[in-house]
Amino acid sequence: MIFDMLPNKIKKEPSKMATMVWPDFGKSFELNEFYRLYESCGGEIGKAYIFFWSTKEIVEFEPLRSELYPSAWRIFASDGGGSYFGFSDEDGKPHFFSCDPIDPTGSVYWLGEWQEFIRRLSKAEYF
């Protein structure tokens, strides 16, 4: 499964498994599938650490995200040391990135689609 490499996954209660965080991308979008099954996760992937925020944390961050970040950006995770992870839906396909929370548009690193994002994250090639 595509989430096997993600550490310390917290499974959702079966009654909450229908959540689609980003409905515009549909059920096949990797993060919608992740959040359908899991509440969050965190730990090392290769040389990097990542913490996938819970759906509650994503919703709570939304007002700040909409104020500080481009409207097409969605933030869903951090590395615990100064980088946020998100994706942009500017062209109808999700492209993942990392950015500095203090200067997000001045420090964005584009990391590709899901498989490339995970590969680059595992090698700590995201800043």
Where are the regions a protein language model picked out?
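Intrinsically disordered, low-complexity regulatory segments enriched in Ser/Thr/Pro
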Residues: G92-I102
